[in-house]
C-alpha cells in the first residue's frame, strides 16, 4: 500500500474502464476514463493543481495571496484543493443555477463564493472575477477559458495516460467541451501520436459549436457560449449535439448496466461514444471521458431527468 503525504498526490492516473454491458457491435470496445476517481472528485483536479503551480512559479500570485476564478464548480474544487496546499485563499464566481453540492464542497475546502445572475451566464461570472482581481491586492484571476495551462494540462496528463493504457491502440476519442481545455489538449496529443485518430467533441443543445444559439440547458459542465482562443476546428473531426433527454437517459443506464454513478456531461459523452460504436468496424477502440460523478447533482434531480 502506498503512503502519501498530501491528498493532491492522488491526482491523475485514473482507471480506464472497458464498458461491457452496453449493446455495441462485436469487436468494438468502448472505454471510459473515470475522472471521478481524482481526490476532489473530478477531472478538474488536474487543472486546479497545474494552475496553482503555474501562478506561484511565474509570480502571478505570491504566497498568502488570493486565487480568483469563474467556475461552475469542478474547477473551483480543484483550485481550492491545491490552494489549501500552498497557503492561498480562493474566491470563486459562480452563476446562480449551478449545482449546490459543488458549491458546498468548494466552501468546505475553504473557498468563498460570489454568485452572479443566472441570465448573465458564464460570461457574467468571468466579468465579476476580472473585476475582483483589480480590487484585491496580491490576487490572480486564472481565467481557465483563456489560460493556455488549461489545454496543456491534459496534453501532458490525460492524453498520455490513455495512450499508454491502450498501447496507442486508440481509434476514436470522444469528450465533452465546457472550457474546451480537456478536449483541445487531449485531442492535440492523440493527433500528434496518430493523425488518423478520430476526435469527436460533444456539446448539449444550447451550445454554439454546431451553429446553434446559446441558451440554458440541464446538462451541466459542458456547453460553450463562446469558443476559447486555444481551440479551433482542427481539434475535432465531428460534433455531437446531445439533448438533455439523451444525456440523462444515459446517466441512468450507466448506473443500471455498469454500476457507474456519472454526471450529466458524462451521460452526453457516453451517448456520443455509443453512437460512434454503432458505425464502427470490428477492432475499433473508442475512448471517452467521464469527468465527474452523479453525487454532486442529486439536488438537481439527476436521476429524474434534471432541473
Curated annotation (Swiss-Prot):
Induction: By methionine. Repressed by sulfate and cysteine. Pfam families: PALP. The gene is mccA. Catalyzes the conversion of O-acetylserine and homocysteine to cystathionine. The modification N6-(pyridoxal phosphate)lysine is found at residue 44. Gene3D superfamilies: 3.40.50.1100. Belongs to the cysteine synthase/cystathionine beta-synthase family. One of its GO terms (cellular component) is cytoplasm. Its EC number is 2.5.1.134. Disruption phenotype: Grows very slowly with methionine as sole sulfur source. It catalyses: O-acetyl-L-serine + L-homocysteine = L,L-cystathionine + acetate + H(+). The keyword Transmembrane does not apply. Its cofactor is pyridoxal 5'-phosphate. Pyridoxal 5'-phosphate binds at residues 74, 178-182, 265. GO terms for biological process: cysteine biosynthetic process; cysteine biosynthetic process from serine; positive regulation of cell population proliferation. This is O-acetylserine dependent cystathionine beta-synthase. GO terms for molecular function: cystathionine beta-synthase activity; cysteine synthase activity. Keywords: Amino-acid biosynthesis, Cysteine biosynthesis, Pyridoxal phosphate, Transferase.
Amino acid at each position: 500500500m502506498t503512503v502519501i503525504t498530501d491528498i493532491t498526490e492522488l491526482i491523475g492516473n485514473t482507471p480506464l474502464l472497458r464498458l461491457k454491458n452496453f449493446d455495441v457491435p462485436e469487436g468494438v470496445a468502448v472505454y471510459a476514463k473515470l475522472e471521478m476517481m481524482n481526490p476532489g472528485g473530478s477531472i478538474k483536479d488536474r487543472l486546479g493543481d497545474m494552475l496553482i503551480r503555474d501562478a506561484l512559479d511565474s509570480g502571478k500570485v505570491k504566497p498568502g495571496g488570493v486565487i480568483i476564478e469563474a467556475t461552475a464548480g469542478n474547477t473551483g474544487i480543484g483550485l481550492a484543493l491545491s490552494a489549501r496546499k500552498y497557503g492561498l485563499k480562493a474566491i470563486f464566481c459562480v452563476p446562480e443555477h449551478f449545482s449546490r453540492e459543488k458549491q458546498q464542497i468548494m466552501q468546505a475546502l475553504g473557498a468563498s463564493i460570489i454568485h452572479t445572475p443566472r441570465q448573465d451566464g458564464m460570461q457574467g461570472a468571468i466579468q465579476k472575477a476580472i473585476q475582483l482581481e483589480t480590487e484585491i491586492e496580491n490576487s490572480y484571476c486564472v481565467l481557465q477559458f483563456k489560460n493556455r495551462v488549461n489545454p496543456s494540462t491534459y496534453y501532458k496528463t490525460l492524453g498520455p495516460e490513455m495512450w499508454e493504457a491502450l498501447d496507442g491502440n486508440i481509434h476514436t476519442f470522444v469528450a465533452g467541451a465546457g472550457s474546451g481545455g480537456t478536449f483541445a489538449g487531449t485531442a492535440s496529443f492523440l493527433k500528434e501520436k496518430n493523425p488518423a485518430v478520430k476526435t469527436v467533441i460533444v456539446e448539449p443543445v444550447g451550445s454554439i459549436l454546431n451553429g446553434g444559439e446559446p441558451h440554458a440547458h440541464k446538462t451541466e459542465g459542458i456547453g460553450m457560449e463562446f469558443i476559447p482562443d486555444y481551440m479551433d476546428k482542427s481539434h475535432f473531426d465531428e460534433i455531437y449535439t446531445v439533448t438533455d433527454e439523451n444525456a440523462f437517459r444515459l446517466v441512468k443506464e450507466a448506473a443500471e448496466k455498469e454500476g457507474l454513478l456519472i454526471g450529466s456531461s458524462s451521460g452526453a459523452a457516453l451517448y456520443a461514444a455509443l453512437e460512434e460504436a454503432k458505425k464502427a468496424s470490428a477492432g475499433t477502440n473508442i475512448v471517452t471521458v467521464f469527468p465527474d460523478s452523479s453525487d454532486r447533482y442529486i439536488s438537481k434531480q439527476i436521476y429524474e431527468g434534471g432541473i
